[in-house]
Regions:
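Active-site helix/loop module of the DD-peptidase/beta-lactamase fold
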Residues: 1-25
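Sec/Tat-exported extracytoplasmic proteins
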Residues: 1-5, 27, 34-41, 61, ...
């Protein structure tokens, strides 16, 4: 992929890798990962990840049908995400314009959104939003509407 070095956080000093979270990588590298997912594991003419594995990542694995293998399958529209009420900071006001949007979500709201239909990968990095009304779907939907020619809301 041409990525820089990255770090995986541990659960404690000299402990076990927290593979469900805490992958520290540069913004450009997160975009490369998003592009790899968008292209079903293909980089140029090389299949780096089997396309079948990418497809299996995107099969719903929980009762709500919104989570696959470490990837979110739809915008958070309920007050409890993963059973954690505090996740309301990342609520969505609407579903994604592209219903096939998938995304990776980090600890402080860092998000890699992926739309194959619109050939778009977008990254949101920065500090955790400070207000409870942060809308996790607005930014990506604004981009999707722009590239698709759909009127803004």
């Amino acid at each position: 992929l041409g990525c820089s070095e990255a770090e995986v956080g541990l659960d404690r000093r000299q402990g076990t890798a927290r593979t469900f979270a805490t992958l520290f990588a540069r913004a450009q590298d997160w975009l490369r990962i998003g592009e790899l997912i968008r292209c079903n594991g293909l980089q140029g003419d090389r299949q780096l990840v089997p396309a079948d594995w990418i497809r299996r990542m995107e099969v719903p694995r929980n009762a709500d049908g919104d989570y696959g293998y470490h990837i979110w399958l739809k915008a958070h529209r309920t007050r409890s995400v993963r059973g954690i009420p505090a996740a309301q900071h990342f609520m969505a006001s609407e579903d994604f314009v592209d219903p096939d949007t998938v995304y990776l979500e980090g600890m402080h709201g860092q998000t890699v959104c992926i739309s194959r239909r619109h050939e778009l990968v977008a990254l949101r990095i920065g500090r955790k939003p400070r207000h409870a009304h942060w809308d996790s779907s607005h930014l990506f939907n604004t981009l999707l509407r722009e590239v698709s020619g759909e009127p803004a809301r």
